[in-house]
Amino acid sequence: MHGSRPRIGIAGQLPPPLGGQNLAIAALWKDLQARADIDSVFCPFQFTPTTGQVRRATWHKAWELLKVRNRLMQIKKEGGLDILLFPVGGPQTIPLIRDLFLAPWARAACRYFAIQFHAAGLAEEMKNRPSWLAKRVARLLGKADVAFIMAEANRADPEVCGISDIRVRPHQIPDQTNPLTLSKDRNGMLYVGHLGDEKGTPGLIQAMASVPQELSLTLVGDPLPPWSLQKFRDLAKQYGVSERVNIIGSRAPEEVGAFYSAAELFVFPSVAPYESFGLVLAEAMMWGLPIVASDWKANREVVGPGENFIFPPGRTEDLSQAIVKAAKGRERWPIIGLQNRQRYETKYKLGARLTLVEDLIRIAKS
């Protein structure tokens, strides 16, 4: 330990663009900076300035690799860290190349090397398409002293790397609700997150043609390539639901609460291979919303055993049926929402359990 104060670092990208991992890193960094008993260090990543560059190879990203390496070398030159939290990029080729290049430098910059699997899917990649790249990255990540996962459903990722110290630390978010800001006339369905095939957005728009006409849908988030907001609006028009589908686009985090407050039901049809936790599910529970979600990755584990509406992932028909089933029991939505709010308070509210930052500090002091 560096003197009497542990030196703790976090690497990663802060918003923009908005996304679960970027927002989680921002929250962790804010929590770390608030601690007066440690020295906090941030190693910024700036690989993806816009959502349109997600998982795309660009010269900017190649140059950023060298810049991040230099930042890590400078941290080591300044005495290194007691512990560094490194975010895994995910199972796609571009994130794997990033981790292949940076993981050794991150390992060398700290006494304890901690990795966080917010981006899941490495174990599945190793099982279905075990490329040389994935195998090599798994071996490098296996040099970590500890791995943090958001849910038990993600345990396979650090296990395939050979990491023995695996700790489940769900995201914890501060309570952003306020009785004065809650809409008295909550109405309609809401989706928050990236918009694209892997997130189930096209199927959700298609499903609107088969659900009760009184249900509307609001989509808040950036489109992933090759989609655009206009393409989604054209799709809604194609299925004859454009009058009931409101495609908002991205909004600042402080603005999103107004959409949660006004909604009556949250829908999350993701089938993304990198999905690990679904931060928006915890946010929906915080706002007391009942949930329709795909039975994918950790979704069922996150929402828990309550009366929410879980459907088999990947088929629009199953999504439609889940929404129709939810609509038939609409009178129970306030009760389900209250149950979800209680689950948020016991599991996902900031301070409800040992936080990841507190765990990092304990390890750094050991």
Regions found by a protein language model. Give the residues of each.
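Short alpha-helical donor nucleotide-sugar binding micro-motif in glycosyltransferases
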Residues: 250-251, 258-263
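Glycosyltransferase donor-sugar binding loop
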Residues: 44-49, 192, 216-233, 249
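Short hydrophobic beta-strand element within catalytic cores of glycosyltransferases
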Residues: 286, 290-293
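Acidic donor-binding loop of glycosyltransferase active sites
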Residues: 261-276, 289
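Short, structured helix-loop element that forms part of the nucleotide-activated donor/catalytic region
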Residues: 218-243, 254-255, 332
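Donor nucleotide-sugar binding/catalytic pocket of nucleotide-sugar-dependent glycosyltransferases
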Residues: 136-179
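Conserved acidic donor-binding segment of nucleotide-sugar-dependent glycosyltransferases
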Residues: 305-317, 325-331
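Conserved donor-binding/catalytic core segment of Leloir-type glycosyltransferases
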Residues: 8-10, 180-199, 205-212, 217-220
